[in-house]
Amino acid sequence: MPFIPNTDADRATMLQAVGASTFDDLISNIPEKVRFKGALNLPEALSEMEVLEELNALANANQDTQKVTSFLGGGAYDHFVPSAIGAIISRSEFYTAYTPYQAEVSQGTLQAMYEFQTMVARLTGMDVANASMYDGATALAEAMLLSVAHKNRKEVVLAGKINPNAVAIMQTYGHGQEIHIRQSALENGGADLASVRELVSDKTAAMIVQHPNFFGCLEDVHELQKIAAENNALFIVSADPISLGILEAPGNYGADIVVGEGQGLGNTQSFGGPYLGLFAAKSQLLRKIPGRLSGMTVDKDGNQGFILTLQTREQHIRREKATSNICTNQALNALCACIYMSMMGKEGLTQVASLSIQKAHYLANEIQKLDGFKLKFSRPFFKEFAIELPIPASQAIAKLLEKKIHAGVDLKMAEENGLLIAVTEKRSKAEMNSFVEALKELC
């Protein structure tokens, strides 16, 4: 049967409602010379079965992680997603990307948001977290805006290597407000402390560091925090939440704001999104936090309940008075993260982080044994590392894809030569050994 949305009777009713007798009457104000004439060059209609076959054939062209061993990173990682997550988020009570507009009617959704906020705050070592942002890059840009507004300064300093895509978002956000973004020099894949000291001043609203950074290297966050504090600038940390299963929580070393990409917490890579941004801060910044906050309260009868609270950040007030104009959140993705953290617990998250770091170092050591290959930097790293190789990274990526291996990210995007390799808890020793053998054959 043809899937036509409107019957002749439906169309007649709609035409009558707008005062037109025919479809030609409806479009009479469109000049004849620009109207399409003749038949559209479309294929014959297909049955449902034929459509599914066609779509499956198109989808099979994708080189997804069900078919290809992935060492891709740079912000999106192939972590394991427990099957229970898909089952729970598919329940009709949860399955929406939006926070309800009559929020207090949906107590279950608000409680899930509240639990998510609580776990993110504990994970980052901060006082308060919001109900999520659009993605990690957006969260970082919003943190920059908060710092500029809070300090009444128009300059931020990037210490070390931050994901170039996130920096591009920050530049877009900062352009209209004339925010000056200054980049420190790099030393061995991380922030050059002398350069940072030279850049940070009493004009600096915030120092921003990614830890682990874009190259996977660990930064000297304690020293960087001191430099920020000496100049009364906010200290903003962009963290991989999985790394916090084993690395010190940013709140413990003086971070004022912690942001991050939450995709690794129970969300699939999904060819780039949707993801969710994490945003946590000290209590002094509570009323300036962007996005939505779920809070716990009691009703007039003394019953515990949940509400959206402190809503002076978005569409509930005049645009020029709002501290942020992001008016929603990634509720469904945040729910995935909430379920993931609940299922894994502290020990589970620590195990995921430990396996990732152990496997990454095993692979790095094996690659260094190959002639012509070496680590690009000697700094400690978490689950990602950069290598130099004897041929252009783009060629290595193309050749290994023929062997069903996603070799990594070409560092050309970061204006560097080399290959960025990420290793998660999913990678087996056999997969890593096959990767090493494939690299060996390139020489």
Swiss-Prot record:
EC number(s) recorded for this UniProt protein: 1.4.4.2
Judged by the first EC level, this protein's enzyme class is oxidoreductase
Kindly state which reaction or reactions the protein catalyses: N(6)-[(R)-lipoyl]-L-lysyl-[glycine-cleavage complex H protein] + glycine + H(+) = N(6)-[(R)-S(8)-aminomethyldihydrolipoyl]-L-lysyl-[glycine-cleavage complex H protein] + CO2
Q: Which InterPro entries does the UniProt record give? A: GcvPA, GDC-P_N, GDC_P, PyrdxlP-dep_Trfase, PyrdxlP-dep_Trfase_major, PyrdxlP-dep_Trfase_small
* Record keywords: Oxidoreductase
GO terms classed as biological process: glycine decarboxylation via glycine cleavage system; nucleoside metabolic process
GO MF: glycine dehydrogenase (decarboxylating) activity
Record keyword Oxidoreductase present:
yes
Q: How does it assemble?
A: The glycine cleavage system is composed of four proteins: P, T, L and H. In this organism, the P 'protein' is a heterodimer of two subunits.
Q: Which HAMAP family match?
A: GcvPA (MF_00712)
What does this protein do, in the record's words?
Answer: The glycine cleavage system catalyzes the degradation of glycine. The P protein binds the alpha-amino group of glycine through its pyridoxal phosphate cofactor; CO(2) is released and the remaining methylamine moiety is then transferred to the lipoamide cofactor of the H protein.
Q: What is stated as this protein's family in its record?
A: Belongs to the GcvP family. N-terminal subunit subfamily.
**Name of this chain's protein:** Probable glycine dehydrogenase (decarboxylating) subunit 1
Species source reads Chloroherpeton thalassium (strain ATCC 35110 / GB-78)
Show the taxonomic lineage. Bacteria, Pseudomonadati, Chlorobiota, Chlorobiia, Chlorobiales
